[in-house]
Structures are given as C-alpha cells and as structure tokens.
Amino acid sequence: MKTNCWFNRNRLLSHLPGSFYVLALAVASLTLPSAEAGQPGPASGGFNPCFNFAGPPTQTGPNTIIIFNVTATLTGTFTGSAIITERDVIHADGSITLHGSGIFTDQAGCGTFLFTYSGKGSAVDGSESAHFVGGQGTGCFAGLHTEGTFQGNLVGPSGQCAVAGQGTYSGQILFAP
C-alpha cells in the first residue's frame, strides 16, 4: 500500500499551532513569580493586656458571660499593639472558656494582621492559656500565616484597666502567597 506523503505532511502541519500554544504557555509560566512558601520560623515574645468591660456581665444559668474590650502591647517577634474583643464564659466552678479576635499593628506602622484565639482560664488563680492563629496581613505582614499558643496571668485593676495582666506567646510564623 502506498502512503500519501502530502496527506501526512498536512496532518503534521495541522497540529503545529496547538503545539505552539502549549509551548508558549509553558514558557510563559516560567516567568511567573513562584507560589512557593518560605520556611516556617519561630515566633515568641511577651504581651501586657488591659481589659475593660464592653458592657455589664450577664448571667446565663450558672454561667457569667463577660465581653471585654482589650488593648495589648506586644514585644518580641510581634512588636506593637493589638485591639481585641474577648468573650469569657465563667463557669460555676471558676473555670473560664475564652474566645477573642483582633487586629495587630506593628510598632513601626509597616503593617497589620488579623488573629483569633480560643482557650481556657481560671477565675480562681487568674491563669489563662489559648491557641491563636493569624493571617490576612497588610504591608510587611502580607502573606503572613502564624499559629501558636499563649499563656498569662491576670491581676486586678491597674491604672486605666479593669483587669490587667502579662504573659508570653510562642509559635510559628510563615510567609506564603
């Protein structure tokens, strides 16, 4: 059987434009910025929160619910200030379940990021511990992902604070697209 050379050549030529577009797309993708994340690093430091009542405490069964407006200064990996809203449920046995969210602003003003946390505490000894996550950064915190824990102790009123405290945080920090 005789092969038609002209027919095979046209078939090859008909596939060249598609192959060209695939090749062009592959080359163009090499010029795009990498979507690879950096290596995680440690995050640690201290904080001093100042709690003030957002409203009067409410009683729900045996539990007392308190909403706090919190301002905090932070040192260490995150040096700056935070504005937070925290909801505490104080149970009849003195244990506390706490949840909060806020925004951190860098001391130099280079950026901000949002964070949330949840944890537990004790109205008996004033201790608190929680797990936090942060992200949605701006400026120097664009692409930030952070996660860790904090622990602290609360004391009574101090200056402009209905409740004051101090503590430490530790965790990981990662910048990724």
Please name every model-derived segment:
Residues 11-31:
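Bacterial N-terminal signal peptides
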Residues 37-177:
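Beta-strand-enriched cores of mature, soluble protein domains
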Residues 31-37:
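Signal peptide processing junction and immediate N-terminal pro/mature segment
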